[in-house]
Amino acid sequence: MINYSIIIPHKNIPNLLQRCLDSIPNREDVQIIVVDDNSDPNIVDFDKFPGLNRSNVEVIFTKEGKGAGYARNTGIKYVKGKWLLFSDADDYFSENVNRLFDDYENSVMDVIYIPYKTIDLITGEDLEDGLCVTNLEEDLYKKRSDTLRYRCYSPWAKMVKVSMIERYSIRFEEVVASNDVWFSVNVGYVAKEIDICNYIVYIRNVRYGSLQYSLNKEYLLSRIKVGYKVNDFLYDINKIEYYNYTLWFVLALIKIGLLLFFKQMIIYIYKTHINVQLRSIYRFFKEVVYRIIQ
């Protein structure tokens, strides 16, 4: 019986994908789904593609090149487990993943939030940017579970009941950036019971050339558009205090072009609720002051 399905979108980093696969135990109750997003044959040897020689790995090759959101949605079609996890191809799981599988096989929870730590891929240095056990426990202890539900966007920072996402038809946005935000907010909204594990399960690697750190115009506009959608939803369910920080992406457009920035700023003012604007401005200046002091 398959208890856990893990979806890994991949594009052009086969060595890192192999490392990710090696970190996942070869258990009969674990299904691994790798969805290749039209990788370049000059970079990837498809005859020796990672996972092809492993019994619990299913490799799906797509030619559409529509990004991680499309790849994850494609992977969901093949899920057989009762729990769903995600990993990025350049990340990997800690040795505690076996413990996670043993501890939560029969859990009645809808979502298990997974602590992680962040490592610089080049230097191997531990970074402070991570979802710590202490922070998670504090949020639940102080009954701030909404912080997890509406601010924990990363799909790999949670383990989700498959029956729940199927019941509510929750899927990823098929956009070039921020495909996971809408998915995660909806998962947080519909989940009745949530919990956390009290140990590090996931190792996130920072690559500064990756999508997350790109100031590409298309990526920024995608993040802004998703932010508007999420903030409208949060406003409708009276959770606007967990707003998506769209202003940062609008301000980042200054580095691309002033005309584009002013155009998007006008749209931002028109589309964004006034209380979100005020909160965002306060947050922006608070961060500026903090950086000056530092």
Could you describe each region identified by the protein language model?
Residues 68-72, 89-194, 205-219:
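Donor-binding/catalytic cores of nucleotide-activated saccharide
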Residues 84:
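Short aromatic/hydrophobic "clamp" motif used to bind/position activated sugar donors
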Residues 26, 202-294:
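C-terminal subregions of glycosyltransferases and related glycan-biosynthesis enzymes
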Residues 62-79:
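Glycine-rich, basic loop-to-helix element that forms the pyrophosphate-binding segment
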Residues 9-26:
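Short, well-formed alpha-helical segments that are part of the catalytic scaffolds
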Residues 12, 24, 37-39, 66, ...:
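Conserved short acidic donor-positioning loop in nucleotide-sugar-dependent glycosyltransferases
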Residues 21-61:
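Acidic donor-binding segment of Leloir-type glycosyltransferases
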Residues 3-5, 23, 31, 182:
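Cell-envelope/extracellular polymer assembly enzymes that use nucleotide-activated donors
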